[in-house]
Each structure stands twice: as C-alpha cells, then as structure tokens.
Amino acid sequence: MSASTSSHRPIKGILKNKSSSGSSVATSGQQSGGNIQDVKRKKSQKWDESSILATHRATYRDYDLMKANEPGTSYMNLQDDGEDSVRDVEGEDSVRGVEGKEAMAATDASDHSCEVEEEESNEAYMRKLLLHKQEKKRQFEIRRRLHYNEELNIKLARQLMWNDLQSEDDENEERPQATNEEKTAAEESEEAPLSGGLQTQSCDP
C-alpha cells in the first residue's frame, strides 16, 4: 500500500519540475473547480521581503537630493491692484527714463558684484578645503611613520632593557664579594663586644 502511494507522489526537490507541477495543478483542478482560482490567488499573494526592503522609502531619508544655495534674484515688486498700478509703474519709468536705465545698470552691476563675491568665496572655500586635506594627509603620514617606527622602538627598548639587566647582574656579582668582606668585618666587630659583655656578666653574680 505504501509503494502505491509513493509512486503517485512527485519527488520533492529544490527545483520545480514543470511536468509534475502542471499535472498536480490539473489533478487538483479536476477535484474542485474553485481550487484553481485559490491557487492562483495564493501565488499572487506571496511577498518577496528583499524587494519590499529595497523599495521601501523611509521618510527620514533625503536620497542625497541637491539643495540650491543660490542667492535670491532681484525683481521688482508689482502690486496686483489692477491695470492702473501697471500704468502708474510704466508712467514712472517713462518719466524717470534715464534714471530707470541707470537703476537697471546698477542692478546688473550689483548682480555681477554678487557673482564675483560668490566666486571669491567659492575660491576661498576651495583653498581652505585644499589646505585642510593637505593637513590631514600630512598628519596621516606622520602617524604612519610613527607606527612603522614602533617596531624599531620596541627592539631598541628591548636592547636597552637587556643592557640594564646585564649591568645590574655585573653589579650584583661584584657586590657579594664586597658584602662578604663587610659581613666578616662586621661579625668580628660584633663578636668582640659580646665576649666582653659575657665576661662582665660572669663577674657580677
């Protein structure tokens, strides 16, 4: 009985077999007509988490949009009271005539001076940025040299420590001979008062 049921089941694997998936859908469709629509609906409802995460746009991200840092443009403010105000402005321009042209020339000159100042400020900013980069590079090279010299410094420190230990060992070897002579002299000096003290004590009783 188990052999007959295992022969009807398709072999499950990672890759889909086109013939087995088609036959299983066909057999399930024959069993119930509504199941085909359910299967299609279920397939369409599958979510791909990686695509959701890739297309999800958080509100805090600005997506590196450029921000315009341009100076405001100069313009003439007109009132929207009607045609009379426009005629008044036109009339004033015709009356002023030369003054208006001079004002426009002055506005153009001020725009040009703003552009020159902006270019100068950009140049100053670029110079400052260049100096900052050069300073960072110089500091990096100094730190790198110090780092690479660290191995040599460690070797030198070990050599100095070895020399200090050797000199201390040499001093210790010389000291025991001197201390042995001092100890014998000190013992002799201590023995002399002790023997005299013993004699005085023996006389008293």
From Swiss-Prot:
A GO molecular-function annotation: protein phosphatase inhibitor activity
GO terms classed as biological process: regulation of signal transduction
Ranges for region Required for binding PPP1CC catalytic center, displacing metal ions and inhibition of PPP1CC catalytic activity: 147-150
A Pfam family this chain is assigned to: IPP-2
Transmembrane segments: none
Start and end residues of each stretch annotated as Disordered: 1-51, 70-114, 165-205
Family: Belongs to the protein phosphatase inhibitor 2 family.
Residues covered by region (Required for binding PPP1CC): 12-17, 43-55
Biological function: Functions as a protein phosphatase inhibitor. It inhibits activity of the catalytic subunit of PP1 and weakly inhibits the activity of myosin-associated phosphates.
Lineage: Eukaryota, Metazoa, Chordata, Craniata, Vertebrata
Keywords, alphabetical: Protein phosphatase inhibitor
Biased composition (Basic and acidic residues): 84-102, 174-186
Highest taxon in the source lineage: Eukaryota
InterPro entries recorded: PPI-2
Low complexity bias locations: 19-34
Name of the protein described by the UniProt record: Protein phosphatase inhibitor 2 family member C
